[in-house]
Amino acid sequence: MKIKAISIDIDGTITYPNRMIHEKALEAIRKAESLGIPVMLVTGNTVQFAEAASILIGTSGPVVAEDGGAISYRKKRIFLANMDEEWILWNEIRKRFPNARTSHTMPDRRAGLVIMRETIDVETVRKIIHELGLNLVAVDSGFAIHVKKPWINKGAGIEKACELLGIKPREVAHIGDGENDLDAFKVVGYRIAIAQAPDVLKENADYVTEKEYGEGGAEAIFHVLRVSGYMDF
């Protein structure tokens, strides 16, 4: 099937380990865009961050933010959830673990809770969710713990973004490096894991890059362009 769009994670996928954008990934993204392939940034970060990144990087596709809970395209934002139970959870976590802290981006978030992973581990968060009987899931992105409704994930966000583009999710190639990219892998037509990704992501990928971080992201994009016939091998 012809790939009509590329969705790609930001942190660890088009960046250096220190989260600075990698110039080779920028080059690859702009090559895809020049060939008429819209690139969609998909991130656990806020929609405001994703919108700004899209402008600076030069992507034309929708942005999928907050792990799939927020989509922005052509100055229109769509939110797929609210945060009622997330705040119940956070209040309980703070009682038990006073040193736990959320991301500094929380005031801008509308679809999920982000807890800094160095202050509490994901299994503890999952245990508290279970004890409270909350309809929430906790996922470790490698940078933070994302807590959200079960139906909020990168796959759901990509499906909504595809509606806006007028294409099918199976016409998208997704590139990522974290556990939270698994749901994206379930809906797209082609799946690429970056070299430093966890084994569970690599096991579900069609292709695993040789390079890590932003160099791997660039390798992945050029691989998609070649296997889809947009570039020669």
Swiss-Prot record:
Pfam families given in the database record: Hydrolase_3 (PF08282)
Molecular functions (GO terms): magnesium ion binding; phosphoglycolate phosphatase activity
EC number: 3.1.3.18
Chain sites annotated for binding substrate: 154
Domain of life: Archaea
Catalytic activity entry: 2-phosphoglycolate + H2O = glycolate + phosphate
Keywords of the record: Carbohydrate metabolism, Hydrolase, Magnesium, Metal-binding
Metal-binding in keyword set: yes
EC class of the enzyme, as a word: hydrolase
List of residues binding Mg(2+): 9, 11, 177, 181
CDD domains given in the database record: HAD_Pase (cd07514)
Entry's Gene Ontology cellular component terms: cytosol
Location of the active site: 9 (nucleophile)
Cofactor(s) demanded: Mg(2+)
UniProt family annotation: Belongs to the archaeal SPP-like hydrolase family.
Function: Catalyzes the dephosphorylation of 2-phosphoglycolate.
Protein name per UniProt: Phosphoglycolate phosphatase
Organism this protein belongs to: Pyrococcus abyssi (strain GE5 / Orsay)
Taxonomic lineage of the native organism: Archaea, Methanobacteriati, Methanobacteriota, Thermococci, Thermococcales
